[in-house]
């Protein structure tokens, strides 16, 4: 297979996936970026700082990492479900609300990971995360 053919297939696949998710807009880009940041900071917390609350020893465990990837994958499947529901009713509200909710969850997790590393968190960001947590608790 030539590099041109490979690029064509990758482009077609990427376009199809983006279409399934309602487009590669800023919200979806932000969610994917935040998911990557959360996963990386989780690896740093466990691998470097050994302070992960996800494992008994606080260190890296492949099972904990795999669970994290599975959760993120299922989160994207939930976004896909929300997008398809929007397609049925002719709106974009459900997808947008779902993506924003997952962005909030990823933000909270990133801030928690930074705190476990001893990174000073600006007060404004801490307050914003507290508000997000309270709103998440109300919807549960």
Predicted regions and their residues:
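Core segments of transmembrane alpha-helices
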Residues: 7-12, 71-82
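Alpha-helical transmembrane segments of multipass membrane proteins
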Residues: 15-20, 80, 84
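Transmembrane helix interruption/hinge and helix-loop junction motifs
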Residues: 21-27, 89-91
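Alpha-helical transmembrane segments of multi-pass membrane proteins
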Residues: 31-42, 75, 79-83, 101-109
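Juxtamembrane helix-loop transition segments at the membrane interface in multi-pass membrane proteins
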Residues: 45-57, 120-122
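Juxtamembrane helix-capping/reentrant segments at transmembrane boundaries
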Residues: 52-75
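Canonical alpha-helical transmembrane segment with a positive-inside/aromatic-interface signature
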Residues: 107-140
């Amino acid at each position: 297979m030539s590099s041109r053919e490979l690029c064509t297939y990758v482009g077609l696949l990427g376009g199809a996936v983006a279409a399934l998710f309602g487009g590669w807009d800023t919200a979806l880009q932000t969610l994917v970026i935040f998911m990557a940041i959360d996963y990386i900071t989780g690896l740093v917390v466990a691998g470097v700082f050994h302070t992960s609350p996800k494992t008994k020893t606080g260190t890296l465990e492949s099972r904990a990492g795999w669970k994290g990837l599975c959760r993120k994958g299922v989160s994207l499947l939930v976004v896909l479900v929300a997008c398809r529901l929007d397609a049925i009713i002719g709106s974009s509200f459900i997808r947008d609300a779902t993506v924003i909710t997952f962005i909030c969850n990823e933000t909270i997790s990133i801030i928690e990971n930074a705190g476990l590393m001893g990174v000073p968190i600006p007060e404004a960001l801490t307050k914003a995360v507290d508000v997000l947590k309270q709103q998440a608790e109300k919807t549960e």
